[in-house]
Amino acid sequence: VEWTDFERATIQDIFSKMDYEVVGPAALSRCLIVYPWTQRYFGSFGNLYNAAAIMGNPNVAKHGTIILHGLDRGVKNMDNIKETYAELSVLHSEKLHVDPDNFKLISDCLTVVVAAQFGKAFTGEVQAAFQKFMAVVVSALGRQYH
């Protein structure tokens, strides 16, 4: 993947301003609520009965934060994203048996949460850079499935 200077700077800027402990839980909660079939991968998380339960679930919040810290690894290794996520791809495909389409769903939910957080600063150009980064990460996570 080729990154422009603008894309690199934009991705680094977004992640430097993001509160992982707010954005991560919000994105994962949104995914579990909007796409309820994704809940099947989180059976050990306890009560996911309704939106309020999901948003108040400490296990969802913790895993949402873990997801953001995982994305931070990609930000720090933008020239080596496939290798950065090789082990996570194996884990999600071979051990957890996660449908790789779900990576795109969480990516879309994260984009919505980030856009809401950044407001007018999340311009079309910024969104394009963010979604390009997320598409590369989604591809890397799904790599083991191919």
Swiss-Prot record:
Keyword RNA-binding: no
Disulfide bridge partners, by residue number: none
GO CC term, one of those recorded: hemoglobin complex
Every Globin domain range: 2-146
Descriptive protein name: Hemoglobin subunit beta-2
Keywords tagged on the record: Heme, Iron, Metal-binding, Oxygen transport, Transport
GO MF terms, alphabetically ordered: haptoglobin binding; heme binding; metal ion binding; organic acid binding; oxygen binding; oxygen carrier activity; peroxidase activity
Organism listed in the record: Anarhichas minor
Lineage of the organism: Eukaryota, Metazoa, Chordata, Craniata, Vertebrata
Subunit structure: Hb3 is a heterotetramer of two alpha-2 chains and two beta-2 chains.
Binding of heme b, residues: 63, 92
Superkingdom in the source lineage: Eukaryota
Function: Involved in oxygen transport from gills to the various peripheral tissues.
